[in-house]
Regions:
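Intrinsically disordered, low-complexity regions enriched in glycine and serine
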Residues: 40-41, 149-163, 208-237, 297-306
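Short secondary-structure boundary/capping segments
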Residues: 67-68, 193-194, 257-263
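Short, conserved secondary-structure transition motifs
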Residues: 130-135, 247-256
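A short, conserved alpha-helix within the catalytic core of class I
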Residues: 138-143, 185-202
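A short SAM/SAH-binding and catalytic strip from SAM-dependent methyltransferases
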Residues: 174-189
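Conserved beta-strand signature within the Rossmann-like core of class I S-adenosyl-L-methionine
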Residues: 204-209, 236-250
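Rossmann-like AdoMet/SAM-dependent catalytic core
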Residues: 255-374
């Protein structure tokens, strides 16, 4: 087996570990919300929301939908040009259009779906919205504009998209924010803004609430808490969590080479210094308001194994948190037999989870990396 093929095998298992861990946390979040619901004959089904930051071509919503496990609302945010391409693909593909709740594309004379130009998609269960995460209050601004039908720029309900009035983001519903290889591409202060904005959207009177958008600290001005967000205060508002996956340890020889290789391809990592290791990633979440209560060392060097802010590198996730049968299957499939380089690669990526309590809600009690073992 040549060296290039061996390297690809290690990367394949790394991708598998990342995919399995992030998907597992999303499923755990949705399961906890559903189990915490106390049904009665008159009560509606529990609401749960997922917001994917810098979603790109990710297919998480469609995988959840196919498995019958999609949340009440799934929101994807990315740059306008990325959103336009993805929206056109979804709206022009009958199966994808049906999954998100769009009408089927009109057939062309040749019988194939016609191309549909969209700048966004907004339905009752899915939203694909333009958003520059480098801007002030990026998440809350994108969601507010979707509720207002696109007023204020960034395009407004394009051809084939539904009315902004049908966009049913609920600031009091349990919400999970997912950031996979996103914050590392933002300057540290912009990454902090994203994490703080997500936290404040779940707070009482936060920027995700009805009629909000002003006075919620937009642009980092009045109304914003300074420095930390209270280290797990947030006792009111909605329950929520954030999952962050990014590279780390830029100061090691391997980390320096990794950054140099990416730089040679025109890809800078301006945000890698904001979370240099799992412990720093967990500390960053705490500083920006995400809960630190209930910490322990069980899930990795970031602590918080049974709840609060927890973080670990991908090696620890692979060794201690993923189900044994999943690891065995991946190892056999990819013929993993050289562990030294594999471990080195895995040590240079981290997964972090932050939690926000909300009122009397207990759905996310104990939610963290250790949820992968449940």
């Amino acid at each position: 087996m040549n060296v290039g093929k061996k390297s690809n095998l290690k990367k394949n298992i790394g991708y598998f570990c990342r995919h399995a861990a992030v998907s597992g946390l999303v499923l755990s979040f949705l399961s906890r919300v559903a189990k915490n619901h106390s049904p009665s004959p008159c009560s509606p089904p529990p609401r749960a929301q997922v917001v994917s930051l810098g979603a790109g071509s990710d297919t998480l919503f469609f995988r959840l939908h196919a498995a019958g496990k999609a949340p009440t609302l799934f929101v994807e945010l990315d740059l306008p040009e990325v959103v336009s391409r993805k929206a056109g693909t979804i709206a022009s593909t009958p199966e994808l259009a049906a999954a998100v709740g769009l009408p089927p594309p009109p057939p062309t004379l040749a019988g194939a779906p016609s191309s549909r130009k969209l700048d966004r998609i907004v339905t009752e269960r899915y939203a694909l919205l333009p958003c520059d995460l480098r801007s002030p209050s990026p998440i809350s601004t994108a969601i507010r504009r979707a509720r207002e039908g696109g007023e204020g720029g960034e395009g407004g309900g394009g051809e084939g998209s539904t009315s902004g009035a049908s966009f049913a983001f609920d600031p009091l519903a349990p919400t999970l924010f997912v950031s996979e290889c996103v914050l590392v591409y933002l300057p540290p202060e912009a990454g902090d803004e994203v994490l703080r904005d997500a936290f404040e959207m779940l707070s009482v009177g936060g920027k995700g609430g009805e009629g909000s958008g002003e006075g919620g600290g937009s642009g980092g001005g009045d109304g914003r808490r300074s420095g930390g967000g209270g280290g797990g205060g947030g006792g009111g508002g909605a329950e929520g969590a954030v999952v962050v996956f990014d590279p780390c340890r830029p100061e090691t020889a391997f980390g320096k080479q990794m950054a140099a290789n990416l730089r040679a391809r025109g890809c800078e990592l301006p945000g890698i210094g904001a979370a240099t290791d799992p412990g720093a990633a967990a500390a960053r979440l705490r500083r920006l308001g995400w809960e630190s209560r209930g910490e322990g060392r069980g899930a990795g060097e970031g602590g918080g194994g049974r709840g609060g802010c927890s973080a670990a590198d991908l090696r620890a996730v692979w060794d201690r948190l993923l189900p044994r049968e999943a690891r065995a299957h991946a190892s056999r499939r990819e013929q993993l037999d050289e562990l030294e380089e594999f471990n080195l690669i895995m040590e240079h990526y981290f997964l972090a989870v932050g939690v926000k309590r909300g009122g009397e809600g207990k759905a996310l009690e104990g939610f963290g990396l250790a949820s992968l073992t449940e």
